[in-house]
Amino acid sequence: SEKYLNTDEPTRADLTTASLQKYKNMIDMWGGWKLFQELLEVLNRIAEKHDCSIANIATKFILDKPQVAGVIIGARLGITDHIEDNGKVFDLKIEQDDILLISAVTAKANDLFDVIGDCGDEYR
Protein backbone atom coordinates (compact mmCIF):
# COMPACT_ATOMS: atom_id res chain seq x y z
CA SER A 1 0.00 0.00 0.00
CA GLU A 2 0.96 3.64 -0.11
CA LYS A 3 1.98 3.28 3.53
CA TYR A 4 5.08 1.31 2.51
CA LEU A 5 5.94 3.14 -0.73
CA ASN A 6 9.42 4.70 -0.61
CA THR A 7 10.11 3.55 2.93
CA ASP A 8 13.22 2.00 4.39
CA GLU A 9 13.21 -1.71 5.03
CA PRO A 10 11.72 -2.35 8.46
CA THR A 11 13.89 -3.78 11.19
CA ARG A 12 12.83 -6.65 13.44
CA ALA A 13 11.95 -4.07 16.10
CA ASP A 14 9.57 -2.38 13.63
CA LEU A 15 7.64 -5.60 13.07
CA THR A 16 5.53 -5.44 16.20
CA THR A 17 2.97 -8.14 15.38
CA ALA A 18 3.10 -11.72 14.15
CA SER A 19 1.24 -10.64 11.02
CA LEU A 20 3.80 -7.95 10.16
CA GLN A 21 6.60 -10.45 10.70
CA LYS A 22 4.88 -12.97 8.41
CA TYR A 23 4.26 -10.38 5.68
CA LYS A 24 7.89 -9.25 5.79
CA ASN A 25 9.05 -12.87 5.63
CA MET A 26 6.90 -13.35 2.49
CA ILE A 27 8.45 -10.23 0.93
CA ASP A 28 11.93 -11.55 1.70
CA MET A 29 11.17 -14.94 0.14
CA TRP A 30 9.45 -13.31 -2.85
CA GLY A 31 12.41 -11.13 -3.78
CA GLY A 32 13.29 -8.73 -0.99
CA TRP A 33 12.51 -5.18 0.02
CA LYS A 34 14.20 -3.53 -2.99
CA LEU A 35 12.10 -5.52 -5.47
CA PHE A 36 8.99 -4.90 -3.34
CA GLN A 37 9.68 -1.16 -3.58
CA GLU A 38 10.07 -1.47 -7.35
CA LEU A 39 6.67 -3.17 -7.54
CA LEU A 40 5.05 -0.52 -5.32
CA GLU A 41 6.48 2.24 -7.54
CA VAL A 42 5.02 0.64 -10.67
CA LEU A 43 1.66 0.02 -8.97
CA ASN A 44 1.62 3.61 -7.73
CA ARG A 45 2.24 5.05 -11.22
CA ILE A 46 -0.60 2.94 -12.59
CA ALA A 47 -2.86 3.86 -9.65
CA GLU A 48 -2.24 7.57 -10.23
CA LYS A 49 -3.11 7.13 -13.91
CA HIS A 50 -6.41 5.46 -12.99
CA ASP A 51 -7.14 7.70 -9.96
CA CYS A 52 -7.26 4.83 -7.50
CA SER A 53 -5.12 3.17 -4.84
CA ILE A 54 -2.18 0.78 -5.09
CA ALA A 55 -4.39 -1.84 -3.42
CA ASN A 56 -7.02 -1.41 -6.16
CA ILE A 57 -4.46 -2.05 -8.89
CA ALA A 58 -2.97 -5.06 -7.11
CA THR A 59 -6.42 -6.53 -6.45
CA LYS A 60 -7.63 -6.02 -10.02
CA PHE A 61 -4.38 -7.43 -11.47
CA ILE A 62 -4.96 -10.65 -9.54
CA LEU A 63 -8.74 -10.79 -10.16
CA ASP A 64 -8.17 -10.52 -13.91
CA LYS A 65 -6.13 -13.74 -13.95
CA PRO A 66 -8.24 -16.57 -15.40
CA GLN A 67 -7.25 -18.99 -12.64
CA VAL A 68 -8.43 -16.61 -9.89
CA ALA A 69 -12.07 -16.64 -8.79
CA GLY A 70 -11.79 -14.15 -5.94
CA VAL A 71 -9.55 -12.34 -3.51
CA ILE A 72 -9.76 -11.97 0.24
CA ILE A 73 -9.36 -8.36 1.27
CA GLY A 74 -8.09 -7.91 4.80
CA ALA A 75 -10.31 -6.00 7.18
CA ARG A 76 -10.33 -5.28 10.87
CA LEU A 77 -13.43 -5.21 13.02
CA GLY A 78 -14.76 -1.67 13.31
CA ILE A 79 -12.44 -0.23 10.65
CA THR A 80 -14.44 0.94 7.64
CA ASP A 81 -11.91 3.29 6.04
CA HIS A 82 -11.32 1.14 2.96
CA ILE A 83 -14.85 0.04 2.06
CA GLU A 84 -15.43 2.77 -0.52
CA ASP A 85 -11.91 2.44 -1.93
CA ASN A 86 -12.25 -1.33 -2.36
CA GLY A 87 -15.41 -0.82 -4.41
CA LYS A 88 -13.41 0.98 -7.11
CA VAL A 89 -12.01 -2.39 -8.21
CA PHE A 90 -15.27 -3.32 -9.94
CA ASP A 91 -15.13 -0.35 -12.36
CA LEU A 92 -11.38 -0.49 -12.91
CA LYS A 93 -9.98 -1.58 -16.27
CA ILE A 94 -6.25 -2.26 -16.27
CA GLU A 95 -4.75 -1.71 -19.71
CA GLN A 96 -2.36 -4.13 -21.40
CA ASP A 97 0.60 -1.76 -20.99
CA ASP A 98 -0.13 -1.64 -17.24
CA ILE A 99 -0.14 -5.44 -17.09
CA LEU A 100 3.19 -5.56 -18.90
CA LEU A 101 4.74 -3.09 -16.43
CA ILE A 102 3.58 -5.14 -13.44
CA SER A 103 4.62 -8.41 -15.06
CA ALA A 104 8.10 -7.05 -15.79
CA VAL A 105 8.65 -6.61 -12.06
CA THR A 106 6.99 -9.81 -10.90
CA ALA A 107 9.04 -11.80 -13.44
CA LYS A 108 12.14 -10.89 -11.38
CA ALA A 109 10.63 -12.41 -8.22
CA ASN A 110 10.68 -15.92 -6.85
CA ASP A 111 7.56 -18.03 -7.34
CA LEU A 112 6.31 -18.50 -3.78
CA PHE A 113 4.65 -21.80 -4.73
CA ASP A 114 8.14 -23.09 -5.57
CA VAL A 115 9.69 -21.56 -2.44
CA ILE A 116 7.13 -22.44 0.24
CA GLY A 117 4.36 -24.40 -1.42
CA ASP A 118 0.64 -23.83 -1.18
CA CYS A 119 -1.20 -21.40 1.10
CA GLY A 120 -0.50 -22.29 4.72
CA ASP A 121 2.54 -24.45 3.98
CA GLU A 122 4.76 -21.83 5.63
CA TYR A 123 3.29 -22.97 8.95
CA ARG A 124 4.00 -26.67 8.42
Language-model-derived ranges and their functions:
Residues 4, 72-75:
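Short acidic/histidine-rich active-site segments
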Residues 1, 38, 60-61:
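Hydrophobic, secondary-structure "cap" segments at the distal end of domains
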Residues 1-8:
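Short, solvent-exposed beta-strand-terminating loops
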Residues 57:
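Glycine/threonine-rich phosphate-binding loop and adjacent beta-strand/alpha-helix elements that clamp
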Residues 8-45, 49, 64-70, 82-124:
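Terminal-tail/helix-coil boundary detector
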